[in-house]
């Protein structure tokens, strides 16, 4: 069966620079890597093609030979154990591929996966801090084989294919290319008698309960990292981390903007005109707020230090109260008559002295129409 063109495999032009080839390789490798396509033979074969194409096209000597002779330049190949002769491409794989999948030179042991837990908090809990118990599903070390994957009384043995190196060498013409051992998958060892509980994986599915301390001042989008509380690694490798993602629920009174809190405070029009004192809510309880005479809707009153303390310590935000002047409703006849008398005392709906904003607005409207008729 004819082999595919290396340039077509990576999806690059024949005059592509090495930087473009590396970028294309990364993209393709992530898509078809065996760790992401377990049990998919077609993806595994595709990945081998991608890897082979990358190895040739990023080596100047190999690429020149391929451009001139095609695949014929690398015929007459064979496979052997990992040795010292020939070109060693492990460093290239480490640079380009290791950062993505954690691959390494020689034996490969995978660190445990990180876990994420979404936690909803009330505004009060986020502001003051709280300790919560959470239960999470995870992978933990098998208590029968203690993570080895082997049946008690036995142990893993050196891989007969790679002799414990985790890699084998493929010879193609006068070149030698190293790749992950297909027998042990890079581990360097194989398990002949697997543990009956974990079936050779060294890990089992469990749930665990953790106590999580949430610091005061957190907000939506913040993450708390619990080191080593993720899934345990394969065959004794380091465990991953647990990330607690914070989501603060909407509050019926307060809105938060960074470390400041905002709330709307309704007052009647008499207090707005004459001034007075009202009680406003804070997260620490009720406090008195003095409202000066002639206060308008939208006026902001700042109460310093009544907001949220910074999660990093030090500064504390403020509470900003926005006044909303309410129009009275369901008036009786006596109240309506009093309002009519009040309006008359103003000299009409747009009394110059008592309603400066109304007068300014009406003057502007008059000027607008005067300009239109000129």
Swiss-Prot record:
Q: Write out the ranges of the repeats annotated as CXXCXGXG motif.
A: 142-149, 159-166, 181-188, 195-202
What Gene Ontology molecular-function terms does this entry list? ATP binding; heat shock protein binding; unfolded protein binding; zinc ion binding
Protein role: Participates actively in the response to hyperosmotic and heat shock by preventing the aggregation of stress-denatured proteins and by disaggregating proteins, also in an autonomous, DnaK-independent fashion. Unfolded proteins bind initially to DnaJ; upon interaction with the DnaJ-bound protein, DnaK hydrolyzes its bound ATP, resulting in the formation of a stable complex. GrpE releases ADP from DnaK; ATP binding to DnaK triggers the release of the substrate protein, thus completing the reaction cycle.
* Record's subcellular location: Cytoplasm
Does the record bear Zinc in its keywords? yes
Database matches in PANTHER family? CHAPERONE PROTEIN DNAJ, DNAJ HOMOLOG 1, MITOCHONDRIAL-RELATED
Record's GO cellular component, any one? cytoplasm
> Which SMART domains does the record match to this protein?
DnaJ
Protein family: Belongs to the DnaJ family.
State the organism of origin: Sodalis glossinidius (strain morsitans)
Annotated positions binding Zn(2+) 1: 142, 145, 195, 198
Which protein, by its recorded name, is this? Chaperone protein DnaJ
Matching entries from Gene3D superfamilies are given as: DnaJ domain, Heat shock protein DnaJ, cysteine-rich domain, Urease metallochaperone UreE, N-terminal domain
Q: What does the UniProt keyword field contain? A: Chaperone, Cytoplasm, DNA replication, Metal-binding, Repeat, Stress response, Zinc, Zinc-finger
User: Where's the J domain?
Assistant: 5-70
Assembly and interaction partners: Homodimer.
Q: What is recorded about the domains? A: The J domain is necessary and sufficient to stimulate DnaK ATPase activity. Zinc center 1 plays an important role in the autonomous, DnaK-independent chaperone activity of DnaJ. Zinc center 2 is essential for interaction with DnaK and for DnaJ activity.
Which positions does UniProt annotate for Zn(2+) 2 binding?
159, 162, 181, 184
What is one Gene Ontology biological process annotated in the Swiss-Prot or TrEMBL record?
protein refolding
Cofactor details (free text) = Binds 2 Zn(2+) ions per monomer.
Q: Which cofactor does it need?
A: Zn(2+)
Q: Return the CDD domains for the record.
A: DnaJ, DnaJ_C, DnaJ_zf
- What InterPro entries does UniProt report for this protein, alphabetically? DnaJ, DnaJ_C, DnaJ_domain, DnaJ_domain_CS, HSP40/DnaJ_pept-bd, HSP_DnaJ_Cys-rich_dom, HSP_DnaJ_Cys-rich_dom_sf, J_dom_sf
Q: Where are the zinc fingers (CR-type)?
A: 129-207
